Amino acid sequence: MKTVLLTGFEPFGGETVNPSWEAARQLDGETIAGARVHARLLPCEFGAALDELYRQLDALRPDVAIAVGQAGGRPDIAVERVAINVDDARFPDNAGRQPIDEPVVANGPAAYFATLPIKAIVAGLRERGLPATVSQSAGTFVCNHVMYGLLHRGGPRAGFIHLPFLPEQAIRHPGAFSLKLDDCVAALRLAVELSLTRGKDEKREGGTIH
């Protein structure tokens, strides 16, 4: 049986929950498109997050690996296109580290593109009434750090998805968009399914002008 690694993060930045882990863990043990999903929690820490990710990649040898993170304030589900070789933290991670203008991997390539069918995923989400977009930047915090490290490692079809706040988080952030947990779970389930069943990605617009 094929396997899928789905990772989420612990809460960070003063939050008490993280939608990435709350959604990912709902799919742990589920079979999607003939593949078994294994959800794993990553620390929101530079270095340690990749250490744990690599342990899970070695243990599971997945066919697909999708890392998931929180992007509070985003108005949609963001399917990431690219990860860059830069750690530039606006505030410390959960271990108190705040790297500024440091490489994720010394002497590594400037960037990596996701190998997931990102446009097919976005199209599929929109068809189901879920707000989604192709994102051109995964930021420079631990999410980008993990996405870059995942793609640098190589192996499974891989990429990263950012989820917006959950409603209980948005209450503390007036005006912020939120998405129900059930919708977050449905989005990840579809992303896993399409990553397993779609070959070449769809050729359709998904760019931005800024």
UniProtKB/Swiss-Prot annotation:
Catalytic activity: Release of an N-terminal pyroglutamyl group from a polypeptide, the second amino acid generally not being Pro
GO molecular function: pyroglutamyl-peptidase activity
Record's keyword terms, sorted: Cytoplasm, Hydrolase, Protease, Thiol protease
Gene from which this protein is expressed: pcp
Record-linked InterPro entries: Peptidase_C15 (IPR000816), Peptidase_C15-like (IPR016125), Peptidase_C15-like_sf (IPR036440), PGP-I_bact-type (IPR029762), PGPEP1_Cys_AS (IPR033694)
Name of the protein in question: Pyrrolidone-carboxylate peptidase
Chief site of localization: cytoplasm
Family: Belongs to the peptidase C15 family.
Function: Removes 5-oxoproline from various penultimate amino acid residues except L-proline.
E.C. designation(s): 3.4.19.3
Active-site residues, Swiss-Prot/TrEMBL: 80, 143, 162
GO biological process per UniProt: proteolysis
Source taxonomy: Bacteria, Pseudomonadati, Pseudomonadota, Betaproteobacteria, Neisseriales
Quaternary structure note: Homotetramer.
Enzyme class: hydrolase
Localization in the cell: Cytoplasm
UniProt GO cellular component terms: cytosol
